[in-house]
């Protein structure tokens, strides 16, 4: 049985896109939005929701699917209040890009509600099925909502021990009706994998963009050999001199590499901190590669350098063909 009423807590890009997709593909579903201003008012102006709620309790009343669609720290903070008002037969899910902290918040909450028995199947409490749609944008807010955001995208479900089988199946069917491909993996595997394929790459993109931004602050500084690295002035075709800043000469390659550095720093600080240890291990793996490349450069070892570059190129070309 498909869901009849969906409460979406968080009305920015992800929550708004989910509402738009549900509106377009499952028009019989009633959509209730709960979020901060000005997002919720703008979402209502855009017709993304049938109704707005002024409290979590109001949002959850009558819902058979509840979606945590706010930033991850907000989702974690909402869990106790959501659990207190979640209808017994409802399914709770989230759109967080890190699973561990939300699952921990849920388990602590249900343990407190059931006198310390940290069991998933607590009588009278709805069913939490963690979820992560692998989709997004460097834009935010309800104006960025895209009804096709999830089409042909992967959605990862991380079922918990004790989940009702029909909860997982209904949620999977919902995402498939929105055009997504569904994969299941454990919470721990999810956070390890996405630390390497998403979280560490975002950190790298921000770092490269920051290094480019810092260039030109000290024109004419010595290079590693103590020689002048340049006068720090460029002559344009109109004869005017201008300070040399590397970023002024960036081409498509740098723009491709740093595109995701246009995302919200506040959002990504939250994600990186919430997935701290897996992301640190992923950054260490990237750093080990960079150090190997650096050593090959330092020693002039063309064979080693080519091999390191080839390993990356092989994966990229294979992924581009089949990914």
Language-model segments: which ranges?
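Phosphate-coordination loops involved in phosphoryl transfer and adenosine-cofactor binding
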Residues: 3-5, 89, 152
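Residues at the starts of beta-strands that form the adenosine-phosphate
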Residues: 5, 28-30, 127, 154, ...
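Interdomain hinge/lid region at the active-site interface
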Residues: 243-312
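Rossmann-like NAD(P)(H) cofactor-binding subdomain of soluble oxidoreductases
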Residues: 81-143
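Rossmann-like NAD(P)-binding element
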Residues: 56-86, 90-93
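NAD(P)+-binding Rossmann beta1-loop-alpha1 motif at the extreme N-terminus of oxidoreductases
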Residues: 1-61
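Internal alpha-helical scaffold of NAD(P)-dependent oxidoreductase catalytic cores
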Residues: 149-228, 232-260
């Amino acid at each position: 049985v498909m869901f009849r009423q969906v409460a979406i807590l968080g009305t920015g890009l992800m929550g708004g896109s989910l509402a738009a997709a549900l509106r377009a593909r499952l028009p019989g579903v009633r959509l209730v939005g709960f979020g901060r201003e000005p997002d919720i008012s703008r979402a209502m102006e855009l017709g993304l929701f049938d109704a707005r709620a002024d409290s979590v309790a109001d949002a959850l009343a009558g819902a058979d699917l509840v979606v945590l669609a706010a930033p991850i720290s907000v989702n974690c903070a909402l869990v106790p209040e959501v659990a207190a008002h979640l209808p017994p037969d409802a399914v709770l899910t989230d759109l967080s890009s890190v699973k561990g902290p939300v699952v921990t918040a849920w388990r602590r909450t249900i343990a407190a509600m059931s006198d310390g028995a940290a069991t998933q199947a607590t009588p009278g409490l709805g069913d939490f099925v963690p979820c992560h749609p692998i989709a997004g944008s460097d834009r935010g807010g309800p104006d960025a909502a895209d009804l096709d955001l999830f089409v042909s995208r992967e959605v990862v479900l991380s079922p918990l021990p004790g989940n009702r089988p029909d909860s997982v199946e209904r949620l999977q069917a919902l995402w498939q009706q929105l055009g997504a491909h569904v994969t299941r993996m454990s919470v721990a595997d999810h956070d390890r994998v996405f630390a390497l394929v998403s979280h560490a790459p975002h950190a790298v993109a921000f770092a490269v963009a920051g290094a480019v931004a810092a260039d030109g602050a000290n024109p004419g500084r010595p290079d590693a050999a103590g020689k002048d690295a340049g006068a720090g002035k460029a002559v344009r075709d109109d004869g005017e001199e201008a300070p040399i800043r590397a970023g002024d000469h960036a081409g498509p390659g740098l723009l491709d590499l740093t595109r995701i550095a246009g995302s919200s720093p506040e959002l990504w600080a939250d994600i990186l901190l919430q997935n701290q240890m897996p992301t640190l291990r992923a950054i260490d793996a990237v750093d080990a590669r960079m150090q190997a490349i650096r050593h090959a450069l330092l020693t002039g070892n063309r064979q080693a350098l080519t091999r390191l570059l080839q390993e990356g190129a092989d994966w990229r070309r294979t992924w581009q063909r089949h990914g």
